[in-house]
UniProtKB/Swiss-Prot annotation:
Entry keyword annotation includes Disulfide bond: no
Similarity field: Belongs to the PetN family.
Organism: Nicotiana tomentosiformis (Tobacco)
Subcellular location: Plastid, Chloroplast thylakoid membrane
GO MF term set: electron transporter, transferring electrons within cytochrome b6/f complex of photosystem II activity
Protein known as: Cytochrome b6-f complex subunit 8
Amino acid sequence: MDIISLAWAALMVVFTFSLSLVVWGRSGL
């Protein structure tokens, strides 16, 4: 596993996590 794929995986995780936080925030939780 090279550094490029590792960086992409981390970026997708952070993006998904922040997106879910925004959705939760707008839901009023």
